[in-house]
């Protein structure tokens, strides 16, 4: 039986509370981060566009925590595979557009030096016990990812397919804001100790570039880079995105709109996970036993004597 906990967001505490912060405190932190971008800049606009979806993401993350994100390897690794699929699609398109078409935005994004897909792959190989022996391992990795995607929701599949078909740096910037930003700006670094406790240090390659000294500088560089993406066209009063077929979209607006859609896509990936944690059967058994005892106690005395 599949757990419905991953979609019943009203049945569990908010993610903010699970981390020791109220939803209001989390909102204040989000707003404080937003203000680190330039006034009327792209970073602030992207943050504002995902505000509501980010609140939903916190709640969904809380559901995943309750469902076993940091207590059951099977739950964690399925989440990792889904986000790997999206991230790998994005980074593959970035490299292709930079190399084949000289896309300036992709060039700027890649200049940050991040490539999370290979790190995801190392962790997936560890989490699924895939021997690192070259081509056979890569084939096993591909098969493992395909199996997870096969049982994912239609929304998750559609989100990944959308990224695979992105044709401009403006679209990929919106995806990067959500998929990279969650690790660089968000709680990636804070998740590492819990992941290491559950899965071991060999499953923590994903956090290599977002932990350790220089975290504040990495955040600042990410924010400044986003604010710079459309600054030239803004200064020149030429906002039309010539990378798009319609010729009418503004790069600034296109990135913000794509960012908003990708945040919803990230949430779709989280709702796609439906694995029961290993400990659920024990919780259920205990609950059933408790209910049975309570029910027996409240039976009329005559009925209790006959049982």
Question: For each of these PLM feature ranges, what is it?
Answer:
Residues 2-307:
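Metal- and O2-centered redox machinery and metal/ROS homeostasis
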């Amino acid at each position: 039986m599949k757990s419905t906990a991953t979609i019943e967001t009203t049945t569990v505490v908010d993610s903010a509370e699970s981390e020791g912060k109220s939803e209001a405190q989390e909102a204040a932190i989000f707003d404080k981060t937003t203000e680190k971008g330039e006034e009327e800049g792209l970073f602030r606009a992207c943050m504002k566009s995902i505000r509501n979806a980010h609140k939903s993401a916190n709640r969904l993350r809380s559901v995943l925590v309750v469902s076993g994100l940091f207590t059951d390897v099977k739950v964690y690794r399925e989440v990792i595979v889904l986000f790997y699929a999206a991230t790998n699609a994005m980074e593959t398109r970035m490299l292709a557009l930079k190399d084949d078409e000289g896309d300036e935005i992709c060039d700027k994004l890649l200049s940050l030096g991040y490539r999370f897909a290979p790190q995801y792959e190392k962790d997936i190989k560890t989490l699924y016990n895939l021997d690192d022996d070259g081509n056979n391992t890569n084939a096993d990795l591909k098969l493992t990812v395909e199996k997870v995607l096969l049982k994912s929701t239609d929304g998750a599949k559609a989100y990944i397919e959308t990224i695979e078909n992105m044709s401009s740096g403006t679209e990929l910037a919106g995806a990067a804001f959500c998929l990279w930003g969650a690790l660089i700006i968000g709680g990636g670094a804070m998740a590492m100790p819990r992941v290491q406790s559950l899965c071991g240090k060999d499953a923590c390659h994903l956090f290599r570039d977002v932990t350790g000294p220089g975290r504040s500088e990495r955040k600042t560089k990410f924010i400044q880079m986003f604010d710079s993406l459309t600054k030239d066209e803004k200064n020149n009063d030429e906002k039309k995105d010539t990378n798009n077929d319609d010729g009418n979209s503004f790069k600034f607006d296109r990135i913000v709109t794509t960012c908003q859609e990708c945040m919803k896509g990230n949430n779709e990936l989280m709702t796609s996970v439906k694995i029961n944690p290993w400990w659920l059967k024990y919780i259920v058994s205990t609950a059933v036993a408790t209910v049975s005892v309570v029910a027996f106690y409240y039976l009329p005395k005559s009925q209790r004597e006959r049982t």
